[in-house]
Amino acid sequence: MADLLKFVQNEFVAKKDFPDFGAGDTITVFYEIKEGEKTRTQFFKGVVIQRRGSGTTETFTIRKMSGAIGVERIFPVNLPALQKIEINKKGAVRRARIFYFRELTGKKAKIKDKRR
């Protein structure tokens, strides 16, 4: 059964070429929104909190501050509405899931840049 799922995922799911990113990176996600007859492109810029899953069920969570309110959005990697992902900044974190980032405020909420 697992082999059948892998076969279907590999054959029929369209692979998109997104850059490699992980927790702590600041990225901008451009996605398409349909409002009635019109379609427009909207972007969501924030810090990646986690990546989870594999294959067709892989998702990533982005957090941004809108005023004083934190907004999180979960995107499936294989979402057809995703147009492109830009990496704005690589962050140096030691965890794969940085949920502690939700409680941090002010200068503590800054993520250091990854050294090259």
UniProtKB/Swiss-Prot annotation:
Recorded hits in Gene3D superfamilies, A to Z, give: 2.30.30.790
Query: Is Iron-sulfur one of the keywords UniProt gives this record?
Result: no
Disulphide bonds in the chain: none
UniProt keyword Ribonucleoprotein, yes or no: yes
Per the record, the GO terms for biological process are: translation
Under the heading InterPro entries, the entry gives:
Ribosomal_bL19, Ribosomal_bL19_sf, Translation_prot_SH3-like_sf
Listed NCBIfam families: rplS_bact
Task: Please state which protein family the record places this protein in.
Answer: Belongs to the bacterial ribosomal protein bL19 family.
| Name this polypeptide is given | Large ribosomal subunit protein bL19
Q: Organism source for this protein? A: Flavobacterium johnsoniae (strain ATCC 17061 / DSM 2064 / JCM 8514 / BCRC 14874 / CCUG 350202 / NBRC 14942 / NCIMB 11054 / UW101)
Name the gene for this chain: rplS
